[in-house]
Structure formats: C-alpha cells, structure tokens
A protein has these predicted regions:
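Conserved alpha/beta-hydrolase "acid-adjacent" motif
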Residues: 32, 166-172
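C-terminal catalytic histidine-bearing segment of alpha/beta-hydrolase fold enzymes
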Residues: 174-196
C-alpha cells in the first residue's frame, strides 16, 4: 500500500480513465496546491484522471505542508538519501496507480513544481518504461552527473521557469535542458520573463 495520498479529479467524461496525470507539488505545499491546475488541463484530456499526492514527509519549515526530501541540512549525502527514499515511494505510488487503472507508463505524465519537478525528473528518467511526458516548473536536475549511468527511459520533457524566481535560479532549467539534450532526450525549456 502506498504511503502517498491526496486529492483526485476523475475524468470529465465519467469514463474509465485512459490517462493518468500525476502532480508533484513543491517544498512545503501539499496535493491541494496543484490539483486546481487540472481544471485547466481537463478540457483537453477529458479521459484523464488527475492525482495530486501529498509528498511523503511533513515539512520541517512548514508543519502544515509536506516535502519530498529534506534539504535543510545542506549535507549532500543526507539529501541524496532523502531523494532515493522519496523516489522509491513515488515509484511505488505510480505503479499502484497504473495497476489500479489498468494502464501503462505510456498513458502517464508527471507535472512537477519546484521540488516536485526535481522528483518528476529523477523518477521519470529512471523508470524502465518511458512515460508519455514530464512537465516541470521551476525545478532542477538532482545530481545531473549521475544521470548518464542511471538513465533508463527518455520521455519528452518540457521545462518552464521564471527569470526572477527567488528560490530556484532559472539557470538551473537552462543547465537541465543542456544536460538532457546531451543525452538525446527530447527537451524544451521556456524561460518566462519578469516572472517568479
């Protein structure tokens, strides 16, 4: 049984879902933070179920929110261990949802924000079967130097970042696009001017 749960928006056409869209929220938020985006996407994907799980850990800086992993220590080994634990949890959740709905990775997309983008990229590029797409807002690649050896699939990726983001510098998205392109991954990045 998955450790993750959160809000769900069922298909608009009340049919059995043919697609799964999973939102991965940012540090200190929860699943409610992103599920509202489903209302804007659903008209184009009426046969999709939208899932927005809470990350697995309570957030150290915001006890009302959640985190995928703790980065406050600044210790790379501790952060990496947290990333790996969160990746296992997210992978298990994805597998459970795919099995529950009788779908495969090619019917799945991940949409992440900030730390959720970090997890979406980390997990999505290391799954044995390629998912339909990854969309990431205001994130970065975690341990990009390890990706070449860990890479198992190459889903198309679209990255968006504001050029005045106060938390994660937009250069992280530019660097991610460069690294992913070097690995022959179909990636596009958009830097939004005058946007956090």
């Amino acid at each position: 049984m998955s450790l993750l749960n959160g809000p769900v928006l069922e298909p608009q056409d009340s049919s059995k879902p043919a697609k799964i869209i999973i939102f991965c929220h940012g540090y200190g938020a929860d699943g409610n933070d992103l599920i509202g985006l489903a209302n804007y996407i659903q008209p184009q994907l009426p046969d999709a179920v939208f899932l927005s799980p809470n990350a697995p850990e309570k957030c150290g800086l915001n006890p009302m929110g959640y985190q995928w992993f703790d980065f406050q220590s600044g210790d790379p080994a501790t952060i990496w261990k947290g990333v790996l634990n969160a990746a296992d949890t997210l992978n298990n959740y994805i597998d459970e949802q795919l099995q529950s709905y009788g779908l495969s990775d090619d019917n799945l997309a991940l949409i992440g924000f900030s730390q959720g983008t970090m997890m979406s990229l980390h997990v999505g590029l290391r799954r044995l079967n390629s998912m339909r797409a990854i969309v990431g807002f205001s994130g970065r690649l975690i341990a990009p130097e390890l990706l070449k050896n860990d890479l198992k699939s190459k889903p198309p990726i679209y990255l968006i970042h504001g050029d005045i983001d106060p938390m994660v510098p937009y250069q992280e998205t530019i660097d991610a696009e460069k690294k992913l392109s070097e690995l022959n991954i179909d990636v596009q990045a958009h830097i939004s001017p005058n946007t956090q």
